[in-house]
Amino acid sequence: GNECILLVDAEPLAVKAITAELEDHAPIGRLFDMDVLRPDGSKVERQELGLPGRRCLLCGESAQVCARSRKHSVEELQAKTREILREAVDEADSREAARYACQALLYEVAITPKPGLVDRENSGSHRDMDFFTFQASAAALQPYFAQCVRIGRQGGTPTETLRALRLPGKLAEAEMRRATVGVNTHKGAIFSMGILCGALGRLDRKNWADPDRVLEECAAMAKGIVSEDY
């Protein structure tokens, strides 16, 4: 695997505390093996910080014991490694897509002036909502957008993805109304952005910057929806 040696001007125990934190809590930290050596060449152990030894990725027993005994096959370890990497990438992608979606909603309401519509200066023709209502709604919808991406990552046909988005969309609408005290601020965005985020989940990250490819996936998901629902 990849290796790196760093020379650090810091107290060894302090460096070990940082590396242990990364190993235990970073999304792919379980795959890191970061040793800290003192100037005399001796290794700093986790136990010196009052931390338990690392556990095996597969069975939860002592990682050191499993490694020495070669308890698990290379194939098992490779499969687990791929699973950890895939889950980390999927989680990072879902968070980023949700951030983009919420950012779009916030930017849209912030555009000023928008005659007849809610903006930073007034509520236009609306009497039941204002700029802050939209902010509350956008914040409430971020978990939903992330969920849509994760649903897209589950695979299946475009139609199956759309079907899987329906219940989360209904629950998101209820969450929106709780955040806005009953006001419909983003019902249309729940539908359209939900499909968009689901499409992003279905696509490899490298295709996100290709609007034609993204819209093609959205179209495949929404194909026949009008005739089926109406």
Residue ranges of predicted features:
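Short beta-strand-to-loop capping motifs
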Residues: 5-13
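Alpha-helix N-cap/helix-start motif at coil-to-helix transitions, marked by capping-box chemistry
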Residues: 50, 135, 163-167
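Catalytic cofactor-binding cores of redox enzymes
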Residues: 33-36, 44-51, 57, 177-204, ...
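Glycine- and acidic
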Residues: 64-66, 123, 177-179
